[in-house]
UniProtKB/Swiss-Prot annotation:
Its main location: endoplasmic reticulum. This is ER-derived vesicles protein erv14. The chain crosses the membrane at residues 10-30, 63-83, 115-135. Residues 31-62, 136-137 are extracellular. It comes from Schizosaccharomyces pombe (strain 972 / ATCC 24843). Disulfide bonds: none annotated.
Amino acid sequence: MMSFGSFVYIACLLLNGANMLLQIFCVIMFSDLEMDYINPIDLCNKLNDLVMPEIISHTLVTLLLLLGKKWLLFLANLPLLVFHANQVIHKTHILDATEIFRQLGRHKRDNFIKVTFYLIMFFTLLYCMVMSLIQEE
């Protein structure tokens, strides 16, 4: 039988991997906008549909780590959770097609930082999951 700690690591790993792929997709879409392969309205329509699922899944990851008493990983995820909460409170999480070219550099930078964060967390969670499953045996 799998322990709750192993379940937390597996669930967080899957959600974190999905968020990482989502951010890579966003970076590709922003690059397409720079190269004029996609228009701003289509970009905003596609990416705005993906913003809340990312925020919700990252919130779920953070809550699972808190419930699983994985304090160090919880604290590592807390700054991004605060960043997401700040975006939602100030309503800057939604992309505006009329403003996207002026804010493109900031959005690309934020997405590269998120990709890096999710990549580091992915391998950290993978290591923790493997160690947790080995210790159960």
